[in-house]
Amino acid sequence: MSYQQQQCKQPCQPPPVCPPKKCPEPCPPLKCPEPCPPPKCPEPCPPPKCPEPCPEPCPPPSCQQKCPPAQPPPPCQQKCPPKSK
């Protein structure tokens, strides 16, 4: 007979008597922190201030001054004296 078979034929031993399992104390209930104070609202923003309206745009510089139309010189009306030799 092998050693293992001999081992198996031994009568079973009763299981050891375990001591009763001592449960740990239940956790104390979580202590809630003080409730948060309500969020403090920031001061309301002042209404957006509109920028001053722009001044009227400058009139475009009048570079193109209207010159009086060039007139041909008035024809001489003065009669030239006849040439004297």
From Swiss-Prot:
* Disulfide linkage: none
**Entry superkingdom:** Eukaryota
- Region described as 4 X 9 AA approximate tandem repeats: spans on this chain: 21-56
Tissue-specific expression: Expressed in uterus.
Q: One Pfam family this chain carries?
A: SPRR2
Q: What subcellular compartments does it reside in?
A: Cytoplasm
Per UniProt, the keywords (alphabetical) are: Cytoplasm, Keratinization, Repeat
Q: Which InterPro entries match?
A: SPRR2
What is the stated purpose of this protein? Cross-linked envelope protein of keratinocytes. It is a keratinocyte protein that first appears in the cell cytosol, but ultimately becomes cross-linked to membrane proteins by transglutaminase. All that results in the formation of an insoluble envelope beneath the plasma membrane.
Query: Which protein is depicted?
Result: Small proline-rich protein 2D
Q: Which organism is it from?
A: Mus musculus
